[in-house]
Structures are given as C-alpha cells and as structure tokens.
Amino acid sequence: MKGPTTALLYLDAVSVTFDGFRALNALSLVLEPGEMRAIIGPNGAGKTTMMDVITGKTRPDQGDVLFASGEVDLTTLDEAEIARLGIGRKFQKPTVFEAHSVLDNLRLALACDRRAWKSALWRDSAEERARIDEILGIVRLGDHVDRLAGGLSHGQKQWLEIGMLLAQDPKLLLVDEPVAGMTDAETAQTAILLREINRERTVVVVEHDMDFVRDLGVRVTCLHEGSVLSEGSLDQVSSDERVIEVYLGR
C-alpha cells in the first residue's frame, strides 16, 4: 500500500471492536486527492464503522487514520474539529430543515453558527449569493429556491443536503447510499451530480446499487468482515469469486 505522503486520506491497519465483535479488522485504504471511490459490501462489512472512524464518531482500537498527506492524525480530533478540517458526511436519510426554504437551508449551511429563525433576516453578500447560486446549479434545485424543503421529493432532499455540505467547502465528501429510495431519473442525475462534485473534491460513495456504481465509473473497494476483500474496477471486483460468494451472488 502507498504511504501517506501524497494521500488525502490514509487508513492503515485500522481495527475497531464492539463488545467482542470486530467491526473493522486491520482495514487499510488510501484515497488520493481528487479521487472518487465507491465502497460496496454486505451488511455488517464495516462500511458505516469506517466512515464513523474517519469522521471522529468512533475511535479505532489500533491503526493509523491520517488526512492531508499525513499531516493530520484524525484519531486525535473530535467530530466538530474534523468537520472544520474539511471532511463532510452525508448520511443515508436526508436531514434538512423542512419548514424552511431551499435558499434558507443553504444560508444556514453557509453560516452554521446562526439560528434558523435568523436566516430570514440575513442579507446575503454578493459573494455568498454567488456561492449559493453555484450550489443550486450543481444540485439541480435552481428552480426550487423558494420552495419549502419539506415539499421536495426524496431525491431532491438528498440533493439539498449534499448542497448544504458543499456550502461548508469540504475537501473530502463521504456519501452514504445516496440513491436509496430515488426514482430512476433521480438516480441518473445523482451520478452526474457526484461526478461534477468530484471535479473539485475527493468523494467516497457507499452504495449497494451496482447499476449506480457502474454509472459512476470509478474504482471500487469491496469490504467484508471489516477488511478489504477486493479492489479495482467494477468489472474486476464483480468477477472476483470471493465477492460473488459473500455479496453479489450468482
């Protein structure tokens, strides 16, 4: 495995145990700046725990978790410090402020120390509004700027939450099952959206939808029992007999 010198994210021999269950078992993973990686694997493979470790929610029992060419040891930081460092996480279920407009949701993300009731009184600077307009374009919500977030479709809520993360200008974006529950059209748009985001940011996508992973066209890592089982293109990974046996089936 490559060293941490050039890697944006470097995990080496990371292990996590919960009540005797080893959720991560000497997991090693390297992400280069500007890369998008798809993470697949059966339930219980360690995908969520891996993201918990990266974001500071869970402390590993052992192993290295380094960021920014090895300059930052993420195991020494809490969740808020890691978020400020530039690591954003999108959970599977969208969490947006449903009683507020799309615009106000993005305003809140740009100034996350403000209270929701203040956002309507906040006057955008030209720079802030330009940034919001840019994000609206990326997440396909430019025509819904004044719409309440609660009135959006499930897919649009997912896009809005991704937009809220983009407003915080992350270097690394972790996205958990972004197309679960989406229509086919929304799924196709999400693949395009993530590829656009990947032009400027490193992205990790945890996903079970293999058609969606194929649309992404990126390197794939399959986890099993807390370790990397297989890695390569989707064709390489999906033809691996070990992956077929434990995950894809015949």
What are these regions (language model features)?
Residues 40-42:
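The feature captures the beta-strand-to-loop junction immediately N-terminal to the Walker
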Residues 119-144, 192:
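Conserved ABC ATPase "signature" region
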Residues 74-76, 135-151, 156:
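Conserved ABC nucleotide-binding domain
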Residues 173-177:
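Catalytic Walker B motif of ABC-type/P-loop ATPase nucleotide-binding domains
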Residues 64-84, 122-123:
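ABC ATPase NBD Q-loop/coupling interface
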Residues 55:
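Helix-to-loop junction immediately C-terminal to a conserved catalytic motif
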